[in-house]
Amino acid sequence: MNAKEMRGKEAAELKQELESLLRAHFALRMQVATQQSNKTADLGKLRRDIARVKTIMREKAGQA
């Protein structure tokens, strides 16, 4: 999902998306740590998605 699509969402939806991304990031970190997965590039993608959601949430909070 790109930033333009995220800006159209409500704050509650963004919070739910953030929780989902954080859970996925944790699960992938554990898989990499236990060598069940070697998709380390996906960790970076998830980190950037989390930052993107947090940025948009902060923008919306500043506008309100």
Curated annotation (Swiss-Prot):
GO molecular function: structural constituent of ribosome
Organism superkingdom: Bacteria
Pfam families: Ribosomal_L29 (PF00831)
Cellular component GO terms, alphabetical: cytosolic large ribosomal subunit
SUPFAM superfamilies from the UniProt entry: Ribosomal protein L29 (L29p)
Keywords assigned: Ribonucleoprotein, Ribosomal protein
Matches recorded under NCBIfam families: L29
Family under the similarity heading: Belongs to the universal ribosomal protein uL29 family.
Protein name (database record): Large ribosomal subunit protein uL29
Organism: Thiobacillus denitrificans (strain ATCC 25259 / T1)
Organism ancestry: Bacteria, Pseudomonadati, Pseudomonadota, Betaproteobacteria, Nitrosomonadales
